[in-house]
Structure formats: C-alpha cells, structure tokens
C-alpha cells in the first residue's frame, strides 16, 4: 500500500399462428427469435403480496428473468394461467402468479432483491391492430351496455365458449376478439335487444398523444409503424446500443416503449428484427400541441441560453461566415430535418437553430464541401450570478435550475416536505422552496440540491458552481495554491507489517474476481471508498464484489469467515470529493470477523502528531506479494509542515488531511485506493481519511494527502438516512 401505466401486447398474436407456413414470413422469424421478456412490464425492486390465501403461487430456482418469462408465457408446468412473475435476484428464484397487481386482494410491496414482471396483455387498456391478444378487464360496450359472461347463454345463445377457444382468455364478461375480426374486441351484451357490440378500447398509439417531436412522449406504444416489436431498452440483443436506462434516467426508457431520446423527427425504437435496427413508431399528434413548462426551452433572439434549443434569432451563417442552407431545401445537402418533420422547432428560412439537442445552434451550409456547421458566434446570454452560481454553501441560492448533476428533473418541494422534515430539526423557509428549483434548505455544506422522482436516487446535488472569487475555504495558515496530483497507478502499503488485529471493517473490492481497491464498512449496507475505483458511472455492477472478513486478499484460510456481497448502487460524493458510497445488495452480517468502523463528527480536527494507520492489500515493495493485509503507521501533519515536505507546492483545504511516516518509508501504494486512514481518539477508532491517488508509492519525506472524511460526514449521514436500505 503506499498503500494504496398500461401496456400493449404483441401484434396480432393470433394471426401469427396462421403464418407459419409462409415461405419467409417476418413474423415467424421474429417469433422464433423473440425474447418473451418484451411481453412484460417491469417494476424494479417490487414484489406482490397476496392477501387472499386461495390465490396460488408456483416457485422454482432459475438463473435469469428471461427463463422465468419463457415459462410464464408458455405456462409450462404451471397449474394456472400465468399473468405475472417475480424474479428473486439474490436467490435466483422465480415466483409465478395467476394474478397481477390489478387483482383484488393483491398489493405491491418494495423488495430490494425482487423485480416484478407483469404480462402486458392482462394490464393494458389499449389494443394493437385488431386487438386479438387483448386480455384486459373492460366489460362495457361502446354504447355503455354491460357485457354478457362468455360461459352464459342468457340472454344470448352462442358458440363462443371458453372451452372452445382455449388460449383466447374468454373469462368473466371481458371484451375479447377471439377470431381477430375487424372492429376490435367485442362481447355479447346483457341487453336482450342487442346481441353483440364492439367495446370502446383505444389503440395503443392513441392512448397518449405526442407534442412537437415526441421528446416528452411517455406512452405505452411498443410496436413500430410496420408492426415490428420493439426491443427492450435494457437489453443489447439483437441490437447493441448506448441508450441504457441507468445512463439516461430522464429519458423514460421503460421496458420496450417507443421514445425519442436523440432528437429524431418522432419517437422510435430498436426492433427485434435482426435485419432492422430501428424504425419509427406511429403515434398521433395531440390536437392542441401544449407542452409542460419544464419541456419548453427559454426562447431568445439575441443570445443563446443553455444549448440554444430556444434560440429564435436571425443569424444565418456559421462561425466562419459560410451562409446557411434553407431548412426547406435539399440542395446542396439532402436531409430530413425539415419544417414538416420538426414543426415546433421554428425552422424558418436559413436561420441557425438547434432542433435535435446538439451542443449549440447549427445549420446545413451552402458549401457542398461543408455539410453542417455550428453558429458559435452567437453570444451566450448573460445570466445573473444568483442563477448560475452560488456563494457560501448556497443556502441563499434563488436561481431557477431544476435538474441534478446526473440529468434528473427535480421533484416539487411541496411533495417532499415529509422527507425533508425527517433529516432536519428546524422548520425550513417554505418561501424559498419554489416549485422544483434547486435549493439548500438543510444547510448542506456542499451546495444546492433537490429531490428527484427516481426511487433509486431520492436526491442529488445540482450542477451549480461557486461564484467566481468565492472558493472553498482553506485551513488556517494555509495560503499556498493547490497543485493537482500527478497521475499514478493504483496504490499499495509499502513496507507495512502484516496485521491480524480487529479490522473487520476492512473491505477488498473485486472486479471480476481481481482486487482493485480497499474500502471501509461504515454501516451494514454501506461501504466508503474512493471515486477513482469507479471511474465510469456506467460500469456494470454485476462484475463487482465486496469481500469482508478476510486477511488474505485471495481468501486463503478465510473461507469460514469470509462474506462476499454484491454491489447494488454507486452514490458519488459531492463534486471534487473523490469519494463514493457503495450500497450493498444485502446487508453484511456483523460477527467476530466483520464489523463497522465509526465516522468522525462533522468538521472535527485531529491533533498534529497523532499516530494513525493505513491498511491495504496493495503493492508492498516486493515483486512477490504475499497477499496479506498490511498496516502502516503514519502521524498527522499540519498544513505548514506538510507544505514544507512538498516543497511548498501543496496547500491543504478543509476537505484534505495530511499524514506521513516519521522514519520508515511506508504508506499507501497501488491497490490501496479507497482504503482508510484510521485514527483513535478517546479509545474510539474512526476513519479519518480515505486513500486516493498520490504522488508515488511511499516516497521518502513525502507525506500523503487523504480525503478528510470529517468534512463529508454530513453528506454520508444524509445518504444513509435518505437512501432505502435493502431488506435482509
């Protein structure tokens, strides 16, 4: 260590059966290749609880949700018609149900290890095509007459018995279209004078209309305009893509519904046809194209606000003076960004515009050799400092930003007052909590924030910087400029001695079974480590594990006490903190070998020359590392002395702490990142610092600079208090 809402179904499913003999039918190929998971609506971290003891459940161990879906669709080995299932991710087990969340006597319940999948056929309120696969619960005809039960001959005799049309779900008196006839689902009526009548069930393309180009469309359409089934956004087959739900949480990437995340003329989706990567979806325009206030960009004519999507000025040349091509012209460049396709983007004449969410206004040019160019000569709008920056900790910030740093739209404060009261001990100033604007009602040291509508990220900081000249305070007598650390490889504790003391809070973070970083167990479900261990927000967490209760990094001899836990979520620290909190998929079990370590009080300081320790499995100065956990003893240095050792090139601010070895060359190195600097005060051991990349491995007379945990203690407590903990 230096150390170191309602959903559609498959198109004309009943017709597909009659197409099997056609020579090269698309539907046949699609059905063979189709992943049945596309037929289900997913509710993450949710399970169903039945209050009626007569309702049956079937369960069996299976490896994937896809396998559960296949058995549910085929009803293979099930004594009932499967309408939904839950996949237990931790135990790799399926639970199949003959009911769903709309069934009387059934309720949804949060469960961290569960994902609920409901067959869209049974919960949607719309139809695709003729509605042959509709299995919803509408039981009233278009004129308002109650339907006659299918197994009844009163008042009308008929041959449409459930036993004669197996698979058509002729249950109760629900509207159905068992023969796939024109007109859609129908039923025999309870009126002796009216034998049968169609039911008023809308097409899924009409359940929710779209405005403008459908960027805000969140409806249930899951087929393309040619009838192809959409690929799930959370799947990479048959087409690999970048639009992952976790990467774009505000784009509405639910299941396999049509969306428009990239500024195309209208909503689209990837398809299940390997030969057709994507197609547009047929969704009707709203009669009155009104948009929510949060969807409308600020219109400007003399300057650009944000990315300039609301620019409506008359600049008509790119940055180097080349004139723009008219938007309604196809010469010299052909394109589909026309006034007809983008009716609400004001594509008049040849004015610079940003219809597709690019980084700034642009246009096609009249030069055949220059297809497009940015109009970067348009100035940025002047924004008052109260809107685009904050002073102090931002408690008086009154700007109108309403998005988090991860791109999530803020939730209205009035909807979150109960949650806010849970972690503050005073009555917040409601007059400041306007709409869903970023604010700092709890005096957070790290700036304005807001609640979100995402249950996985209850709240987050907003991308607002401190105003110019209002910098982070430095520690007393520290007045030298901060120099960025040179890039180094992962750190390890060099010349540390093996330790077998009680360090049950020490964590080895593994990526594909290889140790990459250390960490500290601060709560049963939470690990504190360094951001450098997770450089990308979009890495697949299934490849990561947390090993606890071990002394040997390979687990040799530690099998009986070792706990291996999956990581379910990353929570990045405040901007510039170099910290990340890991939420475990299930809580660690505290015993003689696994324990938690205390956090310091917010803002506390530790006296100079206090002896502390760093722990890690990193590089030890030897080619043949034994893989044992090592400890190196360091002492706390003040700013002045630390700066001297760094030739005056380093100044500590309030988020940093300095510690070094007195004589022996020891300290963190490769593999120790994320590990703790542990100090003892009043017989209590605490994690005072976190190891982050330094300036080399245990360089003589070069003390290490750690992230000062005390400065971020309130943030850590706030995360633990507000983020839901997985159930054991």
From Swiss-Prot:
GO molecular function, one term: growth factor activity
Organism: Felis catus
Glycan attachment positions: 292, 400, 566, 653
Post-translational modification: The single-chain precursor undergoes proteolytic processing by TMPRSS13 resulting in an active two-chain form. The single-chain precursor undergoes proteolytic processing by HGFAC resulting in an active two-chain form.
Family annotation (SMART domains): KR, PAN_AP, Tryp_SPc
S-S bonds: 68-94, 72-82, 126-204, 147-187, 175-199, 209-286, 230-269, 258-281, 303-381, 324-363, 352-375, 389-467, 410-450, 438-462, 485-604, 517-533, 612-679, 642-658, 669-697
All copies of domain Kringle, residue ranges: 126-204, 209-286, 303-381, 389-467
Modified residues (Pyrrolidone carboxylic acid): 30
Function: Potent mitogen for mature parenchymal hepatocyte cells, seems to be a hepatotrophic factor, and acts as a growth factor for a broad spectrum of tissues and cell types. Activating ligand for the receptor tyrosine kinase MET by binding to it and promoting its dimerization. Activates MAPK signaling following TMPRSS13 cleavage and activation.
Subunit: Dimer of an alpha chain and a beta chain linked by a disulfide bond. Interacts with SRPX2; the interaction increases HGF mitogenic activity.
Signal sequence, renumbered to the chain: 1-29
Coiled-coil ranges (or none): none
Gene Ontology, cellular component aspect: extracellular space
Protein family membership: Belongs to the peptidase S1 family. Plasminogen subfamily.
GO biological process: hepatocyte growth factor receptor signaling pathway; negative regulation of apoptotic process; proteolysis
Name of protein: Hepatocyte growth factor
PANTHER family in UniProt: HEPATOCYTE GROWTH FACTOR, PLASMINOGEN-RELATED
Recorded name of the encoding gene: HGF
Keywords: Disulfide bond, Glycoprotein, Growth factor, Kringle, Pyrrolidone carboxylic acid, Repeat, Serine protease homolog, Signal
Peptidase S1 domain: residues covered: 493-721
Motif (Cell attachment site) on chain: 556-558
UniProt domain PAN: residue ranges: 35-121
């Amino acid at each position: 260590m230096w150390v170191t809402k309602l959903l559609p179904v498959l198109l004309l499913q009943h017709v597909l059966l009659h197409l099997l003999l056609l020579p090269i039918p698309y539907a046949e190929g699609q059905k063979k290749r189709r992943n049945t998971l596309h037929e289900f609506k997913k509710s993450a971290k949710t399970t169903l609880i039945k209050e009626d003891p007569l309702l049956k459940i079937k369960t069996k161990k299976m490896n994937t949700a896809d396998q559960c879906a296949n058995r549910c669709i085929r009803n293979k080995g099930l004594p009932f018609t499967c309408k939904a299932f839950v996949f237990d991710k931790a135990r790799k087990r399926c639970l199949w149900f003959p009911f769903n969340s709309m069934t009387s006597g059934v309720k949804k319940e949060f469960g961290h290890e569960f994902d609920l999948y409901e067959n869209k056929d049974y919960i949607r309120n719309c139809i695709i095509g003729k509605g042959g696969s509709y299995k919803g619960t509408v039981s009233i005809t278009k004129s308002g007459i109650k339907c006659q039960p299918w197994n009844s001959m009163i008042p009308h005799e008929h041959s449409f018995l459930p036993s004669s049309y197996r698979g058509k779900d002729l249950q109760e008196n629900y509207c159905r279209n068992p023969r796939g006839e024109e007109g859609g689902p129908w039923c025999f009526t309870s009126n002796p004078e009216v034998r049968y009548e169609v039911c008023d069930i809308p097409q899924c393309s009409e359940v929710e209309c779209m405005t403008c180009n459908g960027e805000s469309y969140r409806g249930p359409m899951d087929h393309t305009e040619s009838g192809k089934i959409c690929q799930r956004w959370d799947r990479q087959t048959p087409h690999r893509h970048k639009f992952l739900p976790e990467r774009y949480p505000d784009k509405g990437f639910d299941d396999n519904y049509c969306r428009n995340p990239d500024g195309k003329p209208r909503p689209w989706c990837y398809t299940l046809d390997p030969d057709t990567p994507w197609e547009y979806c047929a969704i009707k325009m709203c009669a009155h194209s009104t948009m929510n206030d949060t969807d409308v960009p600020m219109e400007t004519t003399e300057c650009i606000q944000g990315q300039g999507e609301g620019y409506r000025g008359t600049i008509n040349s790119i940055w180097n003076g080349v004139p723009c091509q008219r938007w309604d012209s196809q010469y010299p460049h052909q394109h589909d960004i026309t006034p007809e396709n983008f009716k609400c983007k004001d594509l008049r004449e040849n004015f610079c515009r940003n219809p597709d969410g690019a980084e700034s206004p642009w246009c096609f040019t009249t030069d055949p050799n220059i297809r497009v160019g940015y109009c970067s000569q348009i100035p940025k709008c002047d924004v008052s400092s109260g809107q685009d920056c904050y002073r102090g900790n931002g408690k008086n910030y009154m700007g109108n930003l309403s998005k988090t740093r991860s791109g999530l739209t803020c939730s209205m404060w009035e909807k979150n007052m109960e949650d806010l009261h849970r972690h503050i001990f005073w009555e917040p100033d409601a007059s400041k909590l306007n709409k869903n604007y970023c604010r700092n009602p709890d005096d957070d040291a790290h700036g304005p924030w807001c609640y979100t509508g995402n249950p996985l990220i209850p709240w987050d900081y907003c991308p607002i910087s401190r105003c110019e000249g209002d910098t982070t305070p430095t520690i007393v007598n520290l007045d030298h400029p901060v120099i960025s650390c040179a890039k180094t490889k992962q750190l390890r504790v060099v010349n540390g001695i093996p330790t077998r003391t009680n360090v049950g809070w020490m964590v080895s973070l593994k990526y594909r079974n290889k140790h990459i970083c250390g960490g500290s167990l601060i709560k049963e479900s939470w690990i504190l480590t360094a951001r450098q261990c997770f450089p990308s927000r979009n890495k697949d967490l299934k490849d990561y594990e947390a090993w606890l209760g071990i002394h040997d990094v390979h687990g040799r001899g530690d099998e009986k006490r070792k706990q291996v836990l999956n990581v379910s979520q990353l929570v990045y620290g405040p901007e510039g903190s170099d910290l990340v909190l890991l939420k475990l998929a299930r809580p660690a079990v505290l015993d003689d070998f696994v324990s938690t370590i205390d956090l310091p009080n917010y803002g506390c300081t530790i006296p100079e020359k206090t002896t502390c320790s760093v722990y890690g499995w990193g590089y030890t100065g030897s080619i043949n590392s034994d893989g044992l956990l090592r400890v190196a003893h360091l002492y706390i240095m003040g700013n002045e002395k630390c700066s001297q050792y760094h030739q005056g090139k380093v100044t500590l601010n309030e988020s940093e702490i300095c510690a070094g070895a007195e004589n022996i060359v020891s300290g963190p190195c490769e593999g120790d990142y994320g590990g703790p600097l542990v100090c003892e005060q009043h017989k209590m051991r605490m994690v005072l610092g976190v190891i982050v990349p330094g300036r080399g491995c245990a360089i003589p007379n070069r003390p290490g600079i750690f992230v000062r945990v005390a400065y971020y203690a309130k943030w850590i407590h706030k995360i633990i208090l507000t983020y839901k903990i997985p159930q054991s």
